Amino acid sequence: MVIHGACAVFWSHDDRYAEATMRFGLKILFLIAWVVFLLGSFRAPALAQTDRADRHRVPAEFMSYLGADWLERAERVEQEEPERVLDMMNLNPGDVVADVGCGSGYYARRMAQRVAPGGRVFCEDIQPEMLEIMRERVREEGLTNVEAILGTPTDPQLPAGEVDWIIIADVYHEMSDPEPMLAGIRRALAPTGRVALLEYRLEDGSGDQIKADHVMSVRQVVLEWQAAGFELEALHEFLPSQHLFFFRVAGGQRQDPILGDYDLFEALDAGLVEVEAWGADDQNVSLRIRRTAPDPILITSPVGMYFEASNEKRDMVARRDGWVILDEDDWQEWSIRAVGRQRERDLPTSNDELTIRSPSTAPVMEAVLYQVQVGTYTVGNSPTLYPPRTHVVEQAAVWIADADETYRDMESEIAGPRVPPSYATAFALVFVERAGIDVTTRRVWDERQTIFRGLRDQGLNIWYQLQTQ
């Protein structure tokens, strides 16, 4: 089932993957890809893909105003807890606030009530039709302090130096040019102004019901916002599936303490943390970590982080970015989603200590798992396609890329409850190919007819046809 939403499409996965795709769009895609193939040009431009990869994420397409009703779904109150989010912002009457990428005004209308009397709300969107939908809802609710702002993809067009709070709810990942947008947001903030940023979680799987390019990791967000001249004041994790960041302009007038953030390996080198790693199961590694300094700190870790086992146990590799807030002096538990390396070895258990190493320890697996974390692919000039990012797909990709495993040897171990082994292997091959590995040189390619025969996912079938030409 496909439900069009504000920033994403929610997918209900089962074994019938052809029914979990947009049938009509893929039929058109098939015709386009076939024509492109006949013209001898069936690869996307390398430069465009490189530019996107260098950003460490793939910006998503923005949501059309045609899906505006979904923004007002009743379930959103439970899923996103908007009133609690606004409570954390501590808005006051007279505040000047803005909702960037406001859509139907879901947050803007709530803020309007909190900043009255005397306060104003700038409701910014890049679609005039969306702003008209917002205006109608504002009229229905009798609100008089909401002003529509038509922005552009590179400038929110907000008044300079006036805004006390800007909220960006599940929209930042859609900004195709975030640098100028963040510069515009920075200009709009009052001297003590702040930004509340909501993004679905990439790291722990709680946001996996969302398309891959509609989720972000703490590591990705902080990297981009710091580069744009912001500093992290707080990170709140009370929502079921979303991160809530509070940012402010770096070096500004606010005197509140900031939340210092560090890459795990930098923190270890600086003596800021102590950490231990232990086996858990075939999908996770358990870390125990504590800070050595008195102030709370944020630690992030990269996809591809390597965990070396001893006693002939299976090494593990992080399959997503990770994050943990160290706000206590005692040891804290930290679970990292991981995948195993050597198929023939036993998994490490909770009694097996692991040695933490950088992703460069196994660059092939780092490259493959990075592509899995990106979670998208294209065929020719097709729209973005979204393979399932389940453990069995990730595991198959690692075994194919690293150990050149055969389908026959892997089949029983990659038979997940939602993804048949043939689909897991086919999608794994897509990720392996996107990591720069020639899949036709892998032993599993000798079994390609067994794998691809009968698959009903048209994107996979087109991809396969292009590989066999």
Please provide the spans of the model-predicted regions.
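Class I SAM-dependent transferase core
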Residues: 49-90, 96-98
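Class I SAM-dependent methyltransferase SAM/SAH-binding core
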Residues: 98, 104-155
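A short acidic, Gly/Pro-enriched loop at the edge of an enzyme's catalytic core
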Residues: 156-165
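A short SAM/SAH-binding and catalytic strip from SAM-dependent methyltransferases
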Residues: 164-178
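A short glycine-rich, Lys/Arg-flanked "PGG" loop and its adjoining helix->strand segment in the class I
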Residues: 179-194
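Conserved class I S-adenosyl-L-methionine
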Residues: 194-218
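Asparagine-centered strand-capping/turn motif at beta-strand->loop junctions
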Residues: 289-295, 299
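Intrinsically disordered, low-complexity Pro/Gly/Ser/Thr-rich segments with frequent PxxP/GP/PP motifs
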Residues: 308-353
